[in-house]
Swiss-Prot record:
Protein name: Derlin-3
Similarity-based family: Belongs to the derlin family.
Record carries keyword Ribonucleoprotein: no
Taxonomic lineage from the root: Eukaryota, Metazoa, Chordata, Craniata, Vertebrata
Single GO cellular component term: endoplasmic reticulum membrane
One Pfam family matching this protein: DER1
Tissue-level expression: Highly expressed in spleen, lung, liver, spleen and testis. Expressed at intermediate level in kidney. Weakly or not expressed in brain, heart and skeletal muscle.
InterPro entries: DER1 (IPR007599), Rhomboid-like_sf (IPR035952)
Cytoplasmic-side segments: 1-22, 79-98, 190-228
Amino acid sequence: MAGQRLAAGFLQVPAVTRAYTAACVLTTAAVQLELLSPFQLYFNPHLVFRKFQVWRLITTFLFFGPLGFGFFFNMLFVFRYCRMLEEGSFRGRKADFVFMFLFGGVLMTLLGFLGSLFFLGQALMAMLVYVWSRRSPHVRVNFFGLLNFQAPFLPWALMGFSLLLGNSVVTDLLGILVGHIYYFLEDVFPNQPGGKRLLLTPSVLKLLLDDPQEDPDYLPLPEEQPEL
């Protein structure tokens, strides 16, 4: 029964969040069971374009390291903030949400190559957190019961926490940079005098992914509900 409830609850999670989280968990499980090796997953331009190992363009965003505290920490934030974006500012706009992933993924891959970064899942997580935080500026965040601050400070708190764990902050900075570029092009520049939307979601994505109507049973997370 508990397993059935867990499965039913997971199926209630929005599609993009559900698919990305499941892919990350399954990839890590496959590495843990030695069905795959991290050396088969990391981004390597030579192997992608000369050996046609094109899956590396995707798997670089799916592997968050071996099973442990770092993995569960990252999955918690990926699941939470990906879901809040999908149920919040991207509600009813699944194609736009997927296009944000594609835009961010391409830009991170190019910049990550210049910086010799081989796994970019943490950068994608930082981008999701950054975009959510800029679109929810008045939400107060409780950071593990230790700190309480406005949402725009969250990406920097995560970067500081990563530094305390002894990790490099370059990947976090890459995600924040790409998140800011997306936020500027999508939310800031179009509202400037003479500005316009530059990131236009391809029609084929809208045709394939957007729902014809909203789910009448939709219930947003508490953070996304308007205050009375």
